[in-house]
């Protein structure tokens, strides 16, 4: 005899199912369940008197020698990923996702995809949301506290450059030369996050960049503060092509070495990742945004300009002055800062993101951006665009899935593809490392509940350890066991060039983390950017008014006074 439950009661017990929608934080975005892999009446739920007990949902006989037995089951999760919005159990074994479907005991349950045994831990995610760990491709390694602040917003992978608060690192995302690359690789070896380092892309000879890739850099960054010249870009791209590493550029704001067209010519159709493609973070003034329409360019934004608010412009001017070592007493320095900040291009940037013309969201951490706000700003922007532009094509009432999948891709899979690490991380898919973020729907985008790194709980909301339960206040984000000891080395990744990997960089400099090579970075086009592959035929910026036109139509939006995911969640 079957037992019937009404939809509301079912959702309270087992989480939403097909036909239900979940509101994301205090935004007006609703994620609708597209498919439910669990079986009604046979859900694998943990707890006293529930299913995951010996001989019921837990196999009484299967040992870990059976590869179908997982180390961890995340039960009844609502998964939000570029691949879809689904309800499923997630099986994790040896630090990787091995199954997404239905977990339990095959002796008592039908159609089980993976086995829960005596060796299996359970994380109850009924009513919770699971996303892939976020990836920030634009981090200035200035403070050693950056990984912790990133984890606060579900960012588990950092790419960038720097050596600490040196002026070169304050301004540019480059870790220059073998000495600094080696020492920084060693410095982050005990930090609970994945890391990659960008070499300094300058010089009229390829050898000056090549030696940095051999030393373990996982990509190349050309920055105007070190000189973004035609020769420097061309030679850096030659090295990138030779060693299969990503190439990123912060172009010439002052147009000293050439204009936007000259830089575009220096690319020669080769794959390029353009930082802060709007321009306030730097780049050809006023028309760097033209790059967002080129097939060989993978364009990203930095989060201080997203979403466009009434306070954005004033904040940006101050940030430019501090970040780029400018003197407010020197008129030319002030003019330099003012040339980079244009409300018209900031307004257009929001719309280009919503159209899928800007593919990636990053932070520019500590150098005009905030590492702990990458995911949050993404969802604030998505919410703003829904309010100002309405539903995307295919979306409907209580179903914003197309927009949600577009925006989650901006800080998960697309940065992974761009920097050659998508085989390892960047999505909730079988075979990838279990870098996962678990959210309560009411806190989604603002504050994670738990962060897993390589299948181990590493960071999360935790109460007073001196109390009788884990729930008493103060409940704040704290390091968990995965952030300590040898566990850090077994659950976190360091990315290097294939050359450095093949030549034993891990052993040479004594790294303990899992070291992996980046790959497949050089034949990418805009079409490889998941759900964010729109390349307008023409993007034109009026040199006098700075108005932005896409295919001859003005693109703009209004600033907002308040955002979602803001003061309702934070004291300051």
Curated annotation (Swiss-Prot):
The modification N6-carboxylysine is found at residue 221. The keyword Cytoplasm applies. Ni(2+) 1 binds at residues 138, 140, 221, 364. Coiled coil: none annotated. Induction: By low pH and excess glucose. The active site is at 324 (proton donor). Substrate binds at residue 223. Optimum pH is 7.0. Carboxylation allows a single lysine to coordinate two nickel ions. It comes from the Bacteria. Ni(2+) 2 binds at residues 221, 250, 276. Gene3D superfamilies: Metal-dependent hydrolases, Urease, subunit C, domain 1. Its cofactor is Ni cation. The keyword Hydrolase applies. Optimum temperature is 60 degrees Celsius. Its main location: cytoplasm. Heterotrimer of UreA (gamma), UreB (beta) and UreC (alpha) subunits. Three heterotrimers associate to form the active enzyme. Belongs to the metallo-dependent hydrolases superfamily. Urease alpha subunit family. This is Urease subunit alpha. It comes from Streptococcus salivarius (strain 57.I). The gene is ureC.
């Amino acid at each position: 005899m079957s037992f019937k439950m009404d939809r509301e009661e079912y959702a309270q017990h087992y989480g939403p199912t097909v036909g239900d929608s979940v509101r994301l934080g205090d935004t007006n975005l609703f994620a609708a369940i597209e498919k439910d892999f669990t079986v009604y009446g046979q859900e694998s739920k943990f707890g006293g008197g529930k299913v995951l007990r010996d001989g019921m949902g837990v196999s009484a006989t299967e040992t870990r020698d059976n590869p179908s037995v997982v180390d961890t089951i995340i039960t009844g999760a609502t998964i939000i990923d570029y691949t879809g919005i689904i309800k499923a159990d997630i099986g994790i074994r040896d630090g990787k996702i091995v199954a997404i479907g239905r977990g339990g005991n095959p002796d008592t349950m039908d159609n089980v995809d993976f086995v829960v045994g005596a060796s299996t831990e359970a994380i109850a995610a009924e009513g919770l949301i699971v996303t892939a760990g976020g990836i920030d491709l634009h981090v200035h390694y200035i403070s050693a506290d950056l990984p912790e602040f990133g984890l606060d917003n579900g960012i588990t992978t950092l790419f960038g450059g720097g050596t600490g608060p040196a002026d070169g690192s304050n301004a540019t995302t480059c870790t220059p030369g073998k000495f600094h690359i080696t020492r920084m690789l060693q410095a982050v070896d005990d930090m609970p996050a994945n890391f990659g380092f960008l070499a300094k892309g300058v010089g009229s000879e390829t050898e000056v960049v090549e030696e940095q890739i051999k030393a373990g850099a996982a990509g190349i960054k050309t920055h105007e503060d070190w000189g973004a010249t035609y020769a420097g870009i061309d030679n850096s791209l030659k090295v990138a092509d030779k060693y299969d590493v990503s190439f990123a550029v912060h172009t010439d704001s002052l147009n000293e070495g050439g204009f936007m067209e000259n830089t575009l010519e220096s690319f020669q159709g080769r794959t390029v990742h353009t930082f802060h493609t709007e321009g306030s973070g730097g780049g050809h003034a006023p028309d760097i945004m033209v790059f967002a329409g080129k097939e060989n360019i993978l364009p990203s934004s930095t989060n201080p300009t997203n979403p466009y608010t009434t306070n954005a412009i004033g904040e940006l001017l101050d940030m430019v002055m501090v970040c780029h070592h400018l003197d407010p007493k020197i008129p030319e320095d002030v003019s330099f800062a003012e040339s980079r900040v244009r409300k018209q291009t900031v307004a257009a940037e929001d719309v280009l993101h919503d159209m899928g013309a800007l593919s990636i969201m990053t932070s520019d951490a500590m150098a005009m951006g905030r590492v702990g706000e990458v995911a949050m700003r993404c969802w604030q922007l998505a919410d703003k665009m829904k309010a100002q532009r309405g539903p995307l094509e295919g979306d409907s009432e209580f179903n914003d899935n197309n927009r949600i999948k577009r925006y989650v891709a901006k800080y998960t899979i697309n940065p992974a593809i761009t920097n050659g690490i998508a085989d390892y991380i960047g999505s909730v898919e079988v075979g990838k490392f279990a870098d996962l973020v678990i959210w309560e729907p009411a806190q989604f985008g603002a504050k994670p509940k738990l962060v897993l790194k390589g299948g181990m709980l590493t960071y999360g909301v935790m109460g007073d350890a001196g109390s009788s339960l884990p729930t008493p206040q103060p409940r704040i984000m704290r390091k968990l066991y995965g952030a300590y000891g040898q566990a850090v080395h077994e659950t976190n990744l360091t990315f290097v060039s294939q050359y450095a990997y093949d030549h034993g960089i891990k052993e040479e400099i004594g790294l303990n983390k899992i070291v992996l090579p980046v790959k497949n970075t050089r034949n990418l086009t805009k079409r490889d950017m998941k759900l964010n592959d729109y390349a307008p035929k023409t993007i034109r910026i009026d040199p006098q008014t700075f108005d932005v036109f896409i295919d001859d139509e003005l693109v703009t939006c209004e600033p907002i006074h308040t955002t979602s995911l803001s003061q309702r969640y934070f004291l300051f």
